[in-house]
Amino acid sequence: MAGPLWRAAAFIQRHRTSLLVGSCAGLFGVQISFHLFPDPIVQWLYQYWPQGQPAPLSPHLWSLFQEVLKDIGVPSGHCYKPFTAFTFQPVSAGFPRLPAGAVVGIPAIFLGGPVTNIEHSVIIHGQRVDWQSPAGTRLRDALTMSHNAQKFALAKEVVYLESGVAALQTLPAPACLAGTWAISVGAKHALGLYGGPMSLRTAFNLVAIVVGYVAYTFSKDSLTLALEGWLDRRTASLSAAYVQGGVEFYEKILSGNLALRSLLGRQGEKLYTPSGNIVPRHWFRINHLPYTTRRDSLQQMWRATVSPGRF
């Protein structure tokens, strides 16, 4: 056992710079590939398939999307490929400035019919939704959004794609890996651990890995929270209608989550908080800005728009 371990350690020691560069490039490449080649991966994952056939993009959704592009002022040379998605919120990926372009999944619920029809059966987390129940009625109302709310939801995705922040979100992983390696190597040289027993260096490396992972989660989550807040403010700054639509959009999400919390019973209590926010998967991480925080931020913008003299 000692022989292979020593050979592996010696190999890593000789080629550590090449391994570091390759690992950082691999982390960056894996994350960015989803945006470099969004079609047909994203559409395959989120395409709406009613009655076993992919739903074409309706003229209404196409018109809505074009209206949003016009409001934002997207150049005609930027490539967008919208499609009908089964999700409750829009999804997107890609870089519109590149030849592969960007794809945007527009929820089928924006049409109203697939959800507002009580005869249409919907299964969420393995349970069929009872549209006649109070929670089912509340969910159906939450999924029915106004024109302004739909525009805000779509515009937020377009702003995300136009700003290119997807590339920024891929940086924490390789940056933290390189930083952890550089600091750990420097610390081991300073402490003279390279002249000591291998077990001591192994223990130090394990501690460095834990510290590096904590730094990665903190930087990634902090960046995500900052970007989500910026996207909301940037989208709402388009006009007062977008501010109003943003407030309604997050109100609808919170209301829908509360309805799902009731419909799903004990499982719903594990997924959603009593306020309608999503329960974090890990107790030490906040992966996304709470919906209540995003709604309250836009409500402040709306009050400032309605009564500018008071602020």
UniProtKB/Swiss-Prot annotation:
Q: What is its main location?
A: mitochondrion
Q: Which residues form a coiled coil?
A: none
The portions of this protein that span the membrane are 18-38, 165-185, 191-211
Q: Which residues lie on this side of the membrane: Mitochondrial matrix?
A: 1-17, 186-190
InterPro entries cross-referenced by the UniProt entry: TMEM177
One annotated Gene Ontology cellular component of this protein: mitochondrial inner membrane
UniProt subcellular location: Mitochondrion inner membrane
Q: Its domain of life?
A: Eukaryota
| Keywords of this entry | Membrane, Mitochondrion, Mitochondrion inner membrane, Transmembrane, Transmembrane helix
What is this entry's stated membrane topology? Answer: Multi-pass membrane protein
Q: Does the keyword Transmembrane apply?
A: yes
Q: Which residues lie on this side of the membrane: Mitochondrial intermembrane?
A: 39-164, 212-311
Keyword Transmembrane helix found: yes
Return the similarity comment: Belongs to the TMEM177 family.
Subunit architecture:
Found in a complex with COX20, COA6, MT-CO2/COX2, COX18, SCO1 and SCO2. Interacts with COX20. Interacts with COX1, MT-CO2/COX2, SCO1 and SCO2 in a COX20-dependent manner.
User: Which PANTHER family is this protein grouped with?
Assistant: TRANSMEMBRANE PROTEIN 177
Q: What does this protein do?
A: Plays a role in the early steps of cytochrome c oxidase subunit II (MT-CO2/COX2) maturation and is required for the stabilization of COX20 and the newly synthesized MT-CO2/COX2 protein.
The name on file for this protein is Transmembrane protein 177
